[in-house]
C-alpha cells in the first residue's frame, strides 16, 4: 500500500514545473531527480539492494551513450549518429585505469554487442562495473534505437555505504502526467526493494536541477 497519494504528487509536480518553466526558465533541459533518504537500515549489516526498472517516459532524452560493438553494430551506430568503439579501440586503452575511468566518465551509459559482452571484463577490467556502467547487451536482431531508448528509460536504485541516493525520474519538458507516472512507479519499485518497505523510507523529495526541493514524504 502506497503511503503517498497521486493527488499530492501531482500538486508538487505542478508547482515544480511551474517554477522551472515559468518563474525561472533556464536555457537547458533541467532533470528532475527523486532524492531518497532511508532509515532503520544498516548498510554494513543489511543486504545492499540493487535493482533496475524501466520507466514509461524517458527521464533524460539527451543522455550520452557509447556502443562497444562488433562491425555490424558499429555500422548501425554510425548510421544512427551514435558514438561507438570497436574491440581494437578498447585494446588501445591497454587496461590503463586512468583511461578507462575517463571513458566511464565521458558517457552516461554503454551498450555492447552480445558477441562482445563476455570480453568486456578482459578488455577493460572492472572499471565500468565500478562506475555502475556495465554495458547492456544488444543483439543483431534488436532494433538499436529501441534498445537505446530502453537504456535511457531504465533507472537503477543501488544502496552503497550511505543512506541517501538520487535517481533521475524525469525532466521539466515532460507533461505533468508523464512525470507523475514516472515518479509513482519509481517510488513503488524502490519500496519493493526495501527490507521493511515503507518503514525504511525516511524521506522522499523531488527536485529539478535548479528548483527548490519539494518534499513528498
From Swiss-Prot:
Single GO MF annotation: RNA binding
Main subcellular location: cytoplasm
GO cellular component: cytosolic large ribosomal subunit
Keyword Transport in record: no
Subcellular location: Cytoplasm
A matching Pfam family: Ribosomal_L1
Keyword annotations from UniProtKB, A to Z: Cytoplasm, Ribonucleoprotein, Ribosomal protein
Domain of life: Eukaryota
Family, similarity comment: Belongs to the universal ribosomal protein uL1 family.
Protein name from the UniProt record: Large ribosomal subunit protein uL1
Amino acid at each position: 500500500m502506497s503511503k503517498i497519494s497521486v493527488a499530492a504528487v501531482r500538486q508538487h509536480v505542478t508547482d515544480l514545473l511551474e517554477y522551472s518553466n515559468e518563474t525561472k526558465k533556464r536555457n537547458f533541459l533541467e532533470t528532475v531527480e527523486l532524492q531518497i533518504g532511508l532509515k532503520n537500515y544498516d548498510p554494513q549489516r543489511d543486504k545492499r539492494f540493487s535493482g533496475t526498472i524501466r520507466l514509461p517516459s524517458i527521464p533524460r532524452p539527451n543522455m550520452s551513450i557509447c556502443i562497444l560493438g562488433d562491425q555490424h553494430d558499429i555500422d548501425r551506430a554510425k548510421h544512427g549518429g551514435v558514438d561507438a568503439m570497436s574491440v581494437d579501440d578498447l585494446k588501445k586503452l591497454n587496461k590503463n585505469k586512468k583511461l578507462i575511468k575517463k571513458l566511464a566518465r565521458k558517457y552516461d551509459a554503454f551498450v555492447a554487442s552480445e558477441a562482445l559482452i563476455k570480453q568486456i571484463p578482459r578488455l577493460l577490467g572492472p572499471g565500468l562495473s565500478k562506475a555502475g556502467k556495465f554495458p547492456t547487451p544488444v543483439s543483431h536482431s534488436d532494433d538499436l534505437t529501441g534498445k537505446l531508448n530502453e537504456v535511457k528509460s531504465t533507472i537503477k536504485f543501488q544502496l552503497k555505504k550511505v543512506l541517501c541516493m538520487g535517481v533521475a525520474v524525469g525532466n521539466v519538458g515532460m507533461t505533468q502526467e508523464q512525470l507523475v507516472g514516472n515518479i509513482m512507479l519509481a517510488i513503488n519499485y524502490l519500496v519493493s526493494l526495501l527490507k521493511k518497505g515503507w518503514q525504511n523510507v525516511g524521506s522522499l523529495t523531488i527536485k529539478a536541477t535548479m528548483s527548490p526541493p519539494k518534499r513528498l514524504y
